Amino acid sequence: ETYRYDFGFFKGSLLLDMDHQLLRLGVVDTAFALEPSDIKSFRILEDGEVLYEGEKGNFRSYKSDIRERLKELKPRIEEYKMLRHEYEIMAEMERNREQNGRDNDRDFRDRVTEPDFNVPNPVDKFAVEIILEHPYWKNFYKETGAPKFNSDHPSTIDYLDDYTQKTEELHTLAQNLMQLIDPQAQ
C-alpha cells in the first residue's frame, strides 16, 4: 500500500499500491484489486461539479467558486454573530440578577431565545468516480463529506481552511490516480 484515501468510518477506502500497480476499492478485507488497464478515467466532484479529472495522457483541474459562495454567506454569518453576542450579554445580565437575588424578571428566558445558526454550508459533498473497463465492474462512485461551519462560532476563514485541507487531500488522490493510470503524466 503506497497511498490510502478513507471515505469515512465504515465507508471503505481507496488504496493504491504503486509498487505492484494495483488499485484496491472497497473495505480493506474485501477490496477488489484492479490493474491500471482496468481504469478508463476518474473524476473528483464538488456538489456534482468536476474539480479534477483524468484519463491516460490527460489530467485537468478546475477552479471552484468557493470564495464567491463564502462571500455571499458572510453577511448572514455576521448577523448570527451579532445576535449571538447580544444573547450572551443578556444571559450574563440574567445570571448576575439571579446571583444578586434580584430575580424579578422571571420570564426573561421566554423573551430572549438563543439564536440558531442555520446558514447552509457552501459545499454539501465531494465524490470520487472511477470509470472502469472491467468485465464485472463498470464504475466506482463514493461520496465523502465536506467541511461544515462550526455552529457556535462560524467563520468563513476557518471554513476556507478546512475546505483547502480537504481539496488538497483530494488533489493528492487525483495525482496518485493519474500516476497509476499514466506513469508518464506530469
Language-model features: locations:
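Generic marker of residues within folded, mature protein domains
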Residues: 4-6, 29, 118-120
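Terminal and domain-flanking low-complexity segments
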Residues: 92-186
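Phosphoinositide-binding peripheral membrane targeting modules
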Residues: 19-66, 152
